[in-house]
């Protein structure tokens, strides 16, 4: 999936949870949503993008600050577990 599409999807999640009065709860909500509903390959692509662009800036698209913080703080949990054959 193209990174711009993933950023736009993640930003919509961030905009939803931004309305929460408790920032920590909002960060947890973003991370939980991405963990539960994004396929492992989508999470891998987003994490790989952040390896290349830690500020979340893709040039034409930029990660919402809440999403950037949520993914960065929960990177280990969001990293898909490799299956052993």
Give the location of each predicted region.
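Intrinsically disordered, low-complexity, basic-enriched segments
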Residues: 1-85
């Amino acid at each position: 999936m193209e990174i711009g599409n993933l950023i736009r999807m993640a930003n919509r999640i961030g905009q939803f949870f931004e309305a929460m009065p408790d920032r920590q709860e909002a960060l947890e909500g973003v991370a939980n949503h991405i963990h539960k509903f994004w396929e492992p390959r989508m999470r891998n692509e987003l994490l790989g993008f952040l390896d290349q662009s830690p500020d979340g800036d893709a040039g034409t698209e930029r990660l919402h600050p809440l999403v950037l913080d949520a993914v960065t703080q929960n990177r280990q949990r969001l990293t898909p577990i490799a299956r052993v054959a």
